[in-house]
């Protein structure tokens, strides 16, 4: 079986967002860098959570009562509901919307194990960590590219198992 490690496919220059950043600021960072999720780090650069587009949408859709229960794109919310969602995005911080149960892997972890975790936990990206410092990120797109490339060595699927950590 082909062995590719996280370090072989991960993005090394990871765009992160600092704890305390507004949700609006994080959304702008995502748009600017064309990413759908960001590791959230503290002042020392330690991972404290993950923020995804879904987290932002869920926070925004659950904020104003006028938008609850409606289907996005099917029914237009009242203008004041959109304004309220925008105000909240400006005033609330990433830690109000981020996920703190984060699946993480090390640089040596097999890509096959990362792919399995993505399926099991219904996640689109996993941070690659050294201790609690983010050294890379692997997205589903990275895994698909690795499958398409089809290169690597033999691997033992029981090595380098990922873990879910409560941050």
Feature locations, PLM:
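Bateman/CBS regulatory modules and CBS-like beta-alpha motifs in cytosolic regions of diverse proteins
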Residues: 1-29, 35, 40-43, 47-48, ...
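Short hydrophobic beta-strand motif reused across regulatory alpha/beta modules
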Residues: 49-52, 57, 137-144
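A short, polar/charged loop-to-alpha-helix boundary motif
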Residues: 57-72, 144-157
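Contiguous N-terminal and early-domain "leader" segments and peripheral loops that mark the onset or edge
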Residues: 58-61, 110-113, 122, 133, ...
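A contiguous, mid-protein "functional segment" used to position or interact
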Residues: 122, 127-151
């Amino acid at each position: 079986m082909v062995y590719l490690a996280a370090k072989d496919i991960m993005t090394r220059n990871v765009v992160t967002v600092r704890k305390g950043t507004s949700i609006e600021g994080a959304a702008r960072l995502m748009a600017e860098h064309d990413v759908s999720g960001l590791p959230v780090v503290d002042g020392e650069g330690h991972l404290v959570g993950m923020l995804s587009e879904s987290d932002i949408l869920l926070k925004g859709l659950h904020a104003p009562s006028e938008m609850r229960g409606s289907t996005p794109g099917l029914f237009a919310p009242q203008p004041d509901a959109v304004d309220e969602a925008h105000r909240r995005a400006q005033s609330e911080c990433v830690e109000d919307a981020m996920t703190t149960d984060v699946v993480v892997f090390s640089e040596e972890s097999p890509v096959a194990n990362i792919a399995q975790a993505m399926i099991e936990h219904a996640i689109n990206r996993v941070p690659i960590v050294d201790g609690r410092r983010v050294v890379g990120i692997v997205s589903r797109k990275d895994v698909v590219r690795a499958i398409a490339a089809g290169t690597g060595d033999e691997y033992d699927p029981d090595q380098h198992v990922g873990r879910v950590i409560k941050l």
